């Protein structure tokens, strides 16, 4: 029951913001006020009853802002979501991005409609993002973070402190939180296999999103990962050495404009520090 109402309030919040245009902060204020009133510090502290109350408050807020109730018909909800994706092609942020990257406006965008898996079905479920190599340094080491009993938005929204993916990351970041390698060793092993397969297939460093639903791993997305200029050089050289790409391909992957990043003083990552 808790999972159902947690998922429902997430849907109302995201649909209300993205499709109906009710600003995100309206929902966050309702949630924050409820947590303060009941002495909760984390979203995971809330019960099924709490989420039921919040879902009703979210719907009431939508009706107050729009003058009409939150749509309950699944077909109306689906077409609203599809229309919102098509409409996003012409928002200001998308226009600026296309201009910066020389992407033609007439290309348009596509919509995928697919069933969803849930990372918030208890402590056998999780969600996370990861890179097949370190996007900051280019080191050939699995890199990423995840959250138990959460959905993908929680990882990027900063609502909860994410946990490291690997024990090496945990030690490097001096984290007190358990790594996925510790708490879900079998799933972590599957993820490592996927990491190798995808990088060998695409022949580039991959940025991946995943969900674990009741101890089953689901891959949601993969794409070529963004990286620093330093990482770009290291990844290109090492992939050529590994035989994944040719030396000619490695040279073509280096953006000449990125050379400027390497000509400035940088902090030594191994220097002693105090925080």
What are these regions (language model features)?
Residues 1-274:
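Nucleotide/phosphate-binding sheet-loop regions of phosphoryl- and nucleotidyl-transfer enzymes
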């Amino acid at each position: 029951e808790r999972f159902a109402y947690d998922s429902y309030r997430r849907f109302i919040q995201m649909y209300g913001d993205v499709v109906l245009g009710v600003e995100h902060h309206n929902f966050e204020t309702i949630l924050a006020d409820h947590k303060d009133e009941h002495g909760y510090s984390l979203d995971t502290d809330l019960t099924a009853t709490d989420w039921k109350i919040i879902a009703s408050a979210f719907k009431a807020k939508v009706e107050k802002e729009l003058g009409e109730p939150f749509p309950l018909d699944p077909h109306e909800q689906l077409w609203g979501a599809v229309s919102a994706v098509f409409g996003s092609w012409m928002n200001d942020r998308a226009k600026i991005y296309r201009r910066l990257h020389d992407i033609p406006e007439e290309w348009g965008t596509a919509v995928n409609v697919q069933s969803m898996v849930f990372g918030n079905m208890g402590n056998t479920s999780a969600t996370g993002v990861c890179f097949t190599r370190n996007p900051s340094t280019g080191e050939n080491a699995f890199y990423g973070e995840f959250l138990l009993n959460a959905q993908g938005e929680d990882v990027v929204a900063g609502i909860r402190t994410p946990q490291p993916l690997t024990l090496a990351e945990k030690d490097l970041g001096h984290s007190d939180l358990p790594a996925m390698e510790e708490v879900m060793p079998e799933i972590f092993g599957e993820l490592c296999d996927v990491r190798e397969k995808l990088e060998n297939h695409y022949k580039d460093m991959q940025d991946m999103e995943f969900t674990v639903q009741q101890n089953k791993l689901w891959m949601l997305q993969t794409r070529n990962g963004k990286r620093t200029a330093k990482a770009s050089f290291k990844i290109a050289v090492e992939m050529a050495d590994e035989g994944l790409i040719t030396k000619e391909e490695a040279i073509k992957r280096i953006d000449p404009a990125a050379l400027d990043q390497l000509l400035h003083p940088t902090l030594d990552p191994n220097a002693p520090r105090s925080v």
